[in-house]
From Swiss-Prot:
Its cofactor is Mg(2+); thiamine diphosphate. Signal peptide: none annotated. Gene3D superfamilies: 3.40.50.920, 3.40.50.970. GO terms for biological process: 1-deoxy-D-xylulose 5-phosphate biosynthetic process; glyceraldehyde-3-phosphate metabolic process; terpenoid biosynthetic process; thiamine biosynthetic process. PROSITE patterns: TRANSKETOLASE_1 (PS00801), TRANSKETOLASE_2 (PS00802). Pathway: Metabolic intermediate biosynthesis; 1-deoxy-D-xylulose 5-phosphate biosynthesis; 1-deoxy-D-xylulose 5-phosphate from D-glyceraldehyde 3-phosphate and pyruvate: step 1/1. The keyword Magnesium applies. This is 1-deoxy-D-xylulose-5-phosphate synthase. It comes from Bradyrhizobium sp. (strain BTAi1 / ATCC BAA-1182).
């Protein structure tokens, strides 16, 4: 039986060079087939979905018009880059997206020449593009540089810093604003398309440039008035561009990002411009072409595997509550008792559990957009006035507000409460989203209480502890995903500051855990017992202030002391070692070891596989104990067998 391909034209395209050989009338078919291939691929792998479907026509048009990879194409964030990957020689691997050894879910320089700049965090594309444009100019090059940025990413200050700089430099940079929420201005029919084409065309630009040159020879008052008349006339006919024009960009748009008859001529005109910078305002729809995603953009922003026919996602029934939900529910309970408790998120309400708080206390919830710097100092201002702000931000994104943590929070000892979600390794999103560094970058700061929850019940108590801390900032870190299924307390009870807890008493080996590796410590202790080694287990709870009494007790009563954490070098283990060194406890026979994440950026995989590769699972802990004893782990396992 003969089978026919659903994507016959796309099948002929291995690189954008093949795409550019096609007739313009064929580009529509390529886009339709590219959308189908994107849907089919993501249904198998899961991943970011809605944004990619929204830029299928734009992606096709850019690669058709511009000479990529010679022309540099930078995607902000990278959520929308799956169609780009399919067109740029990676279609044969597209069903390995976000799996171990497979394609990254974001653009990645080491993956393809068509990815000139890696991305995953928001609002970096214009800065990177400007750097590349200036490098081109200094080198005497002629290639184009295109940065594609979404309207959501435009809420971050970095994007405007870059635009301000680009406008002042008059650099020939092309910025395409992918407005998929129509938050700036919608395209209004044929007139909008006509004007966009007119204003991007050579005739209009030549007349405009000639008028500018003439204006230089006119009296200043007349020249300024003429300039304002021109700006007013464009602004009157083309709503939405005033801000960008003020920043020094030549604004074109808004145009329908799904209409290739509008996109292609405008992009060709922009490509041929000899001056810059230029901003092309393109309006798109998230989830375009897949009805379930069009109807529910938020639910299809990121998906697990799903059935293409129905849109039903294959979500497994949870065995325990997710940490983010435990945080949100705990915060609600605390806020019911204390009207000073407020919640803050930086464009991640559902990811952090702040959405749960928002349903109960909408007026006490603040989503500040992709603006972590602002979020931290905004929280500091609330704290200065006696409120109890909880700033819920992923570990990897909190890095973006570090100076504000130091300068605006810690130096002033303001009681901002940081809820650090996605601490440790996060799996499919890989190195760009791993919460590896907060133990290290917060641990060096004075005036900070630092906690890590070993399970979901501990998180409830730590939220209550943060509410009670009113004289300094505090943080609690917890991972992505489900808890352990432990018995949950009805209400949180504030913990004694700087005090850990003993979980199991042993004799020879002490395992001191900070965070959710505690479960692996318990498995390791059971395995060590099978080898005749008695192990104590302690849950540190606090990195700062450190439970010095507990640390000294473990060091004095055991031959081996091992710290375990889900963080980089310079974190919890370093604090324990420094304290023991200062106490002279490392001068004698104690065998002290620190288990941390490897000093590298780990590629994406499942969290379990990543932790195993890092040696931070039960097997890795047992291996570390045998190494400290000078024994061969493999040989010991064989003996037991």
């Amino acid at each position: 039986m003969t089978t026919f391909s659903k994507t016959p034209l796309l099948d002929t395209i291995k690189t954008p060079e093949d795409l550019r050989r096609l007739k313009v009338e064929q580009v529509r078919q390529v886009a339709d087939e590219l959308r189908q291939e994107t849907i089919d691929a993501v249904s198998v792998t899961g991943g970011h979905f809605g944004a990619g479907l929204g830029v299928v026509e734009l992606t096709t048009a850019i690669h058709y018009v511009f000479d990529t990879p010679r022309d540099r194409l930078i995607w902000d964030v990278g959520h929308q880059a799956y169609p780009h990957k399919i067109l740029t020689g990676r279609r044969d691997r597209i069903r390995t997206l976000r799996t171990g050894g497979g394609l990254s879910g974001f653009t990645k320089r080491t993956e393809s020449d068509y990815d000139p700049f890696g991305a995953a965090h928001s609002s970096t594309s214009i800065s990177a593009g400007l750097g590349m444009a200036v490098a081109r100019d200094l080198s005497g090059g002629k290639n184009n540089v295109i940065a594609v940025i979404g309207d959501g990413a435009m809420s971050a200050g970095m994007a405007y810093e870059a635009m301000n700089n680009a406008g002042a430099m008059n650099s020939r940079l092309i910025v395409i604003l992918n407005d998929n929420d129509m938050s700036i201005a919608p395209p209004v029919g044929a007139m909008s398309a006509y004007l966009s084409r007119l204003y991007s065309g050579k005739t209009y630009r030549t007349l405009r440039d000639a008028a500018k040159q003439l204006g230089q020879h006119l009296p200043k008052v007349i020249a300024n008035r003429a300039s304002r008349v021109e700006e007013y006339s464009r602004g009157f006919m083309m709503d939405g561009g005033t801000l960008f024009e003020e920043l020094g960009f030549y604004y074109v748009g808004p145009i329908d990002g799904h209409n290739l008859d509008h996109l292609l001529p405008v992009l060709k005109n922009v490509r041929d411009m000899e001056t810059g910078p230029i901003l092309v305002h393109v309006v798109t729809q998230k989830g375009k072409g897949y009805p379930p995603a069009e109807a529910s953009a938020d639910k299809y922003h990121a998906v697990v595997k799903f059935d293409v026919a129905t849109g039903t996602q294959a979500k497994a029934k949870p065995n325990a509550p997710a940490y983010q939900n435990v945080f949100g529910q705990s915060l609600v309970k605390e806020a019911e008792k204390d009207d000073k408790v407020v919640g803050i998120t930086a464009a991640m309400p559902s990811g952090t559990g702040i959405d749960i708080f928002a349903k109960a206390f909408p007026k006490r919830t603040f989503d500040v957009g992709i603006a972590e710097q602002h979020a931290v100092t905004f929280a500091a201002g609330l704290a200065a006035e006696g409120f109890k702000p909880f700033c819920a931000i992923y570990s990897t994104f909190l890095q973006r507000g570090y100076d504000q943590i130091v300068h605006d929070v810690c130096i002033q000892s303001l009681p901002v409460r940081f809820a650090i979600d996605r601490a440790g390794l996060v799996g499919a999103d890989g190195a760009t989203h791993a919460g590896s560094f907060d133990n290290a970058y917060l641990g060096c700061l004075p005036n900070m209480v630092i906690m890590a929850a070993s399970d979901e019940a501990e998180l409830v108590h730590m939220v209550a502890t943060q509410v009670a801390i009113n004289d300094r900032p505090s943080s609690v870190r917890y991972p992505r995903g489900e808890g352990r299924g432990v018995e949950m307390p009805e209400v949180g009870v504030p913990l004694p500051i700087g005090k850990g807890r003993m979980i199991r008493q042993g004799k020879q080996v002490a395992l001191l855990s900070f965070g959710t590796r505690l479960a692996e410590c318990e498995k390791a202790a059971d395995e060590l017992a099978a080898h005749g080694l008695s192990a104590s287990i302690a849950d540190a709870r606090f990195m700062k202030p450190l439970d010095e009494e507990l640390v000294l007790k473990l060091a004095r009563e055991h031959e081996i002391l091992i710290t375990i954490e889900e963080g980089s070098i310079g974190g919890f283990g370093s604090h324990v070692m420094q304290y023991l060194a200062d106490q002279g406890m490392l001068d004698g026979g104690l065998k002290m070891r620190s288990m941390v994440l490897p000093d590298e950026f780990q590629d994406h995989d499942t969290p379990a596989a990543m932790y195993a590769r890092a040696g931070l699972d039960a097997k890795g802990i047992v291996r570390k104990v045998f190494e400290a004893l000078g024994k061969d782990y493999t040989a010991e396992v064989v003996k037991l067998a």
